Amino acid sequence: LFSYFCRKNLKYMMSNTDIPLILISNDDGYMAPGINALVDMLAPTGVRLLVCAPDGPRSGYSCAFSSELPLRLKPISRKDNVEIWACNGTPVDCVKLAIDRILGGKMPDMVIGGINHGDNSTVNNHYSGTMGIAKEGCMKYIPSVAFSSCYYNHDADLSPLAPYVRAIVAKVLDGGLPRGVC
């Protein structure tokens, strides 16, 4: 992806470097296979990935945020172009804390929710923490998408999604999304 971006001489907002920064979260927790599959799909492309996800499952939290719970961030790992943090809050808390605390108020080039284990189509998207992540990014005018798998089984093979995920991410980073659309 990164070499493609360089060849295209893109004119999108960059976060301190010429390498795009993507903020990733989910509602299944930072150890869930879906978010790790997403990182594995995108890390080889050369983009920088900041993962800030709940410290455990938070499915069904939609756009909820914590108003009374003291929130904590815990660094998990940092390797090459991937940095992983855990948060004791909701998926939306993760996005807010990543931008405000980890990035010091700087906006990432893109926000991604997922890969969710389970369908988020139709009415389900109103309850989904994965969709809440994309909505939070959208409200901050950051190009945002969410990926979900119809497979609820955490052992599901998500590798067939890789070409689609990479193509969608490249398209969004290349041309953005209309303001307020996720």
Identify the meaning behind each predicted range.
Residues N16-D18, I22, N36-R101, K106:
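A cross-family phosphate/adenosyl-ligand binding-site feature
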Residues D28-N36:
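Short acidic, Gly/Ser-rich segments with clustered Asp/Glu that frequently serve as metal-coordination loops
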Residues D119-S128:
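Glycine/threonine-rich flexible loop motifs
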Residues I133-G137:
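Hydrophobic/aromatic ligand-binding patch that stacks against planar heteroaromatic rings
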Residues D28, P57, T90-P91, N116-D119:
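Short glycine-rich anion-binding loops that position phosphate/pyrophosphate groups of nucleotides
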